[in-house]
């Protein structure tokens, strides 16, 4: 199976960041956007991997949202 390289577009990351800016004049450096995009990509991949392991631990072949919800608290703590 060929692995497809994916990620978040800079525009998407900037919009996500702007949702939490208090000052509308706040600017984000292009390098910071690339770094945040990479962090989001790693976070999503790790969430998917942990959810898959959780499903396997429950002897299930399909990952469901409940598996993501079970691993999310520890995942967030690991990324802080």
Curated annotation (Swiss-Prot):
Presence of the UniProt keyword DNA repair in the record: yes
Keyword Lipid biosynthesis (UniProt): no
UniProt-reported outcome of changing residue 9 to A: Abolishes sequence-specific DNA binding
Compartmental location: Nucleus; Chromosome, Centromere; Chromosome, Centromere, Kinetochore
Top-level taxon: Eukaryota
GO molecular function: DNA binding; protein heterodimerization activity
Subunit-level organization: Heterodimer with CENPX, sometimes called MHF; this interaction stabilizes both partners. MHF heterodimers can assemble to form tetrameric structures. MHF also coassemble with CENPT-CENPW heterodimers at centromeres to form the tetrameric CENP-T-W-S-X complex. Forms a discrete complex with FANCM and CENPX, called FANCM-MHF; this interaction, probably mediated by direct binding between CENPS and FANCM, leads to synergistic activation of double-stranded DNA binding and strongly stimulates FANCM-mediated DNA remodeling.
Protein name in UniProt: Centromere protein X
Organism name: Gallus gallus
């Amino acid at each position: 199976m060929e692995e497809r390289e994916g990620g978040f577009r800079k525009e998407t990351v900037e919009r996500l960041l702007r949702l939490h800016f208090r000052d509308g004049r706040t600017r984000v450096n292009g390098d910071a956007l690339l770094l945040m995009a990479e962090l989001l990509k790693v976070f999503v991949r790790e969430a998917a991997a942990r959810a898959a392991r959780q499903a396997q631990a429950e002897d299930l072949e399909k990952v469901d949202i409940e598996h993501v919800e079970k691993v999310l608290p520890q995942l967030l703590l690991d990324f802080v």
